[in-house]
Amino acid sequence: DGGVRHLLGDATYPFDVMRITCDDADGRRQTRYAHNIAEIGLGANVELARRRLPARLGARRRRFLGFWHGYAATRRRTLHVGYDMKSWDGVGFHVVIGNGQFTSGIRLSPRSYPGDGVLDALVFTGQKSDAYTMMPRIMRHGGHVPDDAIKELRAKIRFSVEADRPLAVIADGEPFGTTPATFQVVPQQILLKL
């Protein structure tokens, strides 16, 4: 009885979600929802490579080998990122769209809050080698921003990401499809009971 008494109160926290539209494996547009973080480029390549490795290797080896396989498969690409009524064009190797801060225990999008009605994007524009020189700062405390090699963008409505060739998209750790992709904020769709 006492263990569930807090459920009777009115204390809730409203979470936003992301409505993601991208191409599936057959080139058809699909729409799905996610609540935390989406990744395009390096992060997606790493996760897809990790999933292809045999489970008998164990979780640590799969993460380690997945990073290096995904890293090897990643190239810097010409990107067009639309956000609300603005846009950014440039070259990058990794795009993070954040509604929440953490993925797999890593504070990847440190300025994102899931109930603020805003999506944040980080476009990694530096050299691909920045991926492993930045990792200690990211893994320790999310101290990778601000950085001259990371473009920070915010959108109250939506992001769109296009590249000079299709790039893999994952969200909340699950494969979603490929670019072109849009990420629309859907405010306060989940109520978390406190």
Regions picked out by a protein language model, each given a short descriptive name:
Residues 1-93:
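Catalytic core of DAGKc-family lipid kinases
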Residues 20-21, 39, 49, 98, ...:
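Short beta-strand-to-turn element immediately C-terminal to the catalytic PLP-Schiff-base lysine
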Residues 39, 43, 96-110, 175:
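Glycine-rich phosphate/pyrophosphate-binding beta-alpha loops
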Residues 43-46, 89-91, 103-106, 129-133:
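Short acidic/glycine-rich loop or secondary-structure boundary segments that cap or lie
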Residues 54-62, 103-105, 111-132:
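Gly/Ser/Thr-rich active-site loops/lids in small-molecule metabolic enzymes
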Residues 75-77, 91-93, 115-119, 155-157:
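A generic structural signal for short beta-strands and their flanking turns/coil linkers
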Residues 83-89, 113, 123-194:
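ATP/nucleoside-binding phosphotransfer catalytic cores, i.e., glycine-rich phosphate-binding loops
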